[in-house]
Each structure stands twice: as structure tokens, then as C-alpha cells.
Amino acid sequence: ARQVINSYNQTFVNTVRATGGNNAIRCLMVPTYAASCSSTTVSDFVLPTDTVANKLIVDIHSYSPYNFALNTSGTSSFTQSDISQLQWTLQEIYNSFGAKGIPVIIGEFGALNKNNINDRVLWGENYLRIAKSYNIRCIWWDNNAFDTSGENFRLLNRGTLTWQYPELLEAMMKGLNS
């Protein structure tokens, strides 16, 4: 399956480049298998060849640490151990891509609402502070879900145009600016 995604990525790059215009030179994002940042998936990833130098960006998803950020049955407390795990994960992403001159974007990240805003604030500040130290850009997965159990990652209330958790947003900005 991983080889199939590698093949799809190469076909995507070839197809977009062949259409001409701005597509001949624009940046393109290519995912690992399932956009996973697991070490096995990353080691099986093959960056497509491209006719334009330095215009490919690897896209991965990282809900880390898993038991805090994504596991509905996991912990709601963000601990020093979680900071260490987050540091390790982001360093591995950097070592696999950024250190080799390959841009990488975390195209999805977030932490479930488990009625633990203070812990999510601490997590958000640390996540973006550490990611910034490795020059990794992150995109919050805002799926507009709020009133459900499970993957409720809404930050922006699209109906009222207000932030659902302004303190989390402020903490992430603090992490970026530290």
C-alpha cells in the first residue's frame, strides 16, 4: 500500500507539472501513506522526482502525543512525559525531512476537547514552540465539530465568527512567538 501511494504521488507531480502555466513551477504537497508520521511509514516514503527543484513539500498528520491528543479513551492531562514524547516526535519528523532539506508541513494537528482546556493550552503552546524550533509549519484540523463526542476540533465558530477557545489560540500564538 505504501508503494502505491508513492506511485500516486509521482503520478500527481508528473500530471500537475505537465499542465503548464503556474502548475509548472508551483509548490506541491505530497503525503506519506495515510499522511502518517510513524517511523515505518516515513522510512517507506519516496519523494517524487520533480522537474522543478525545491518545490515539493511533504504533508503529514501528527496528533501527538496520541493518548492526550486523539485517543478518546486516553488521558486528559498533559504531562512532562507528554512534552518529551512531543519533542521526540517532532524531532523525528525534522530528522526525516527538514534536516535533509525537504520541507514538511503538519497538515493536521489538534487535541480533542476532553473538558481540559488548561492542559490543551499547555499542549498547544508546547506543540507550536517545539515545531517552530524545527522549522515545521502546522495546520490545525478545524473540522467544525464541537457538540459531538470524538473528533471535536473546532476552534472557529463559523456561525458567530468567534473563537471557541481563545485561550488555546493565544497559547499557540505564544508558542510561535517564543
Predicted feature locations:
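Active-site region of glycoside hydrolase catalytic domains
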Residues: 1-74, 91-112, 133-134
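Short, surface-exposed linear patches
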Residues: 50-55, 78-84, 127-129, 162
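Acidic/histidine-rich helix-loop elements
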Residues: 67-86, 160
